[in-house]
Amino acid sequence: MTTKYDDASWHSGGEGYPPEAGPEAGATHIGMFLAWAVLAGHASPELEEDSEDELAALRERTVTPGAFVHDSCDGKLVDHDLDDVGTAFASAYYAGDDEDEGDAGLYLEDYVDAVSPGDGEPEDVYRVPDTWETYELVAPLIDARFAQWDDEGRPAVLRHRA
């Protein structure tokens, strides 16, 4: 059974999505996470085999993270794209507690914090540019959460530090 963590169509087809953003904008935040996983060595052997050329372009930064997800992964982040460690981390950090709708993963919260201006107003996640500059804002937060997750014994759900 495949676990789907996110799908750009859930966003682009959802209420409040800016139609002028185009369907690709729903993949940007997904792409930032998957690019981090790939660059951190957590791509699955299947993804490596099926998307060899596309992954080379991602690693060379000739394709943006959101475009990679949109074009190569059909806009989806699924467990089969990640190795075992990447899957466990995505479950804990990206998905959170599936049993409790109020306990979503911390990733989107961190993403909004990373891309928002310092004026206290959160950025509309669908208007964030799909660029490597955006990735450079987001990746350090994912690195920190991965370190936290690892330090805490790789729990099933990652929560804010007490």
Outline where the language-model segments fall.
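Alpha-helical repeat scaffolds in large eukaryotic proteins
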Residues: 35-38, 116, 143-146
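Amphipathic protein-protein interaction modules
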Residues: 60-137
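N-terminal low-complexity, intrinsically disordered segments
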Residues: 1-68, 72, 77, 81
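Short, surface-exposed, charged/polar-biased interaction segments
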Residues: 54-55, 90, 159
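N-terminal domain-onset segments
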Residues: 1, 154-162
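Polar/charged low-complexity regulatory segments
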Residues: 4-19, 120, 127-154
